[in-house]
């Protein structure tokens, strides 16, 4: 259930950013307005940070209400809270990828996507396994038998966030 909320929030925060930034940057560069192309990047980055931060905080702080009342799945609160910072990360990464595309190079984007998916796969599997075990033990102590799967789901969503963060760190290194 947490991924449904994440997907909607992701569309709101960063769905068309790479395309818009790419188009605006390439138009400026075609007119030899390098400084204006960079201004587009900076303004887009500020927008992405603002919107991404707002949506991330809204999801993180409202995870209890969203999971209980909207999704009717109270234990999905853990996965929602793990996914929330990823919205900011992906929004910033979308702008940087769009900037590179507008500059005429897709190599940094391609490499960052590979890095992102490798980290996502590994961390999702390891995180789900480790946190499932921790949640199961905590559930036995507290009498909540579904705590193990809830923690496991949160562990698997950790891969999404760490994967995005690794891709972003690569792009920041390249830029």
Predicted features along the sequence, with ranges:
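Hydrophobic alpha-helical transmembrane segments
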Residues: 112-126, 130-174
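Selective transmembrane-helix segments that form parts of the transport pathway or gating/packing helices
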Residues: 44-56
């Amino acid at each position: 259930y947490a991924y449904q909320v994440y997907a909607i929030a992701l569309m709101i925060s960063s769905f068309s950013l790479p395309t818009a930034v790419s188009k605006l940057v390439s138009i400026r560069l075609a007119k030899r307005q390098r400084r204006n192309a960079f201004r587009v990047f900076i303004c887009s980055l500020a927008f992405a940070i603002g919107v991404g931060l707002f949506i991330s905080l809204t999801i993180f702080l409202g995870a209890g209400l969203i999971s209980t009342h909207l999704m009717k799945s109270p234990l999905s609160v853990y996965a929602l809270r793990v996914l929330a910072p990823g919205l900011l990360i992906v929004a910033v990464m979308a702008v940087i990828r769009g900037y590179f595309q507008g500059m005429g190079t897709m190599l940094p984007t391609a490499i960052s996507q590979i890095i992102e998916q490798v980290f996502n796969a590994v961390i999702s599997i390891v995180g789900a396994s480790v946190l499932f075990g921790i949640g199961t033990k905590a559930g036995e102590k507290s009498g909540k038998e579904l705590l193990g799967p809830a923690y496991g789901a949160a562990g698997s969503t950790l891969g999404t966030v760490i994967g995005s963060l690794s891709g972003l760190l690569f792009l920041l290194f390249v830029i």
